[in-house]
Amino acid sequence: MYRLRMHAILLGIAFLTATAALAQTGEAPHKNEIGLVIGATETPSIGRIAGGEIDLDSSLALGAEYDRRMFGEHTTLYVGVDFLASPADVKVSYPSPDVSPEYAYLFLSPHIKVKFNSTRTLQPWLSFGGGYADFSPTATKNGDVNVKGRGDSGTLEFGGGADTRPLIQFKGVPLLKNLPIGGRFEVRDFYSGQPHYGVETRGNLQNNVAFTGGLLIRF
């Protein structure tokens, strides 16, 4: 599972970067943005009906994001899609034998985004969307007990962040040399169903809060 997810993430990032490079032409206004981000996802503790809580460790998060500017000059409206996945899996801290000990996640979420001060150096924004969440176990056995962690659901996504104007150019790198590259810093919550932890929990939804930052490519 780990290798499959890593291959999917790397292929997706390579495809988006190549698409941006090939689409770059002249001095036309940039209507498209691709964000390549890395960070961590935090999930609050999950309460158990039998008592106690399921505590989850932070997990590495890798993401790719595409946005298309629809209209606006200083305040602009974008539509796009977010992809976020965990190449390193979410682990339960000190899991009991009946709890699924770890799982991987994947979120794919179309969204709308409103960006402010689009012509300034620092450009704050807010986004809202919804899509698909997938949870897959990487270990289905904890001790002598078989547990399952697989599950999928819908997700609501809401968050905010800030982009910067272009800061660097890779002039000596083929394909990338003409692309203006800025920075992106963001916090997003993917509010979704839960993976199957193997025990009954209080409620069936959870917050998956991603803190990420990285490069923003415009073309």
Model-inferred region functions:
Residues 1-30:
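Cleavable N-terminal export/targeting peptides
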Residues 23-70, 212-218:
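Short glycine/proline- and aromatic-enriched beta-strand/turn motifs that initiate or cap beta-hairpins
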Residues 28-29, 164-219:
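Predominantly the C-terminal beta-signal and adjacent terminal strand-loop region
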Residues 32-36, 77-81, 106-108, 122-130, ...:
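Transmembrane beta-strands of outer-membrane beta-barrel proteins
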Residues 60-142, 153, 167-170:
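Gram-negative (and chloroplast) outer-membrane scaffold detector with strong preference
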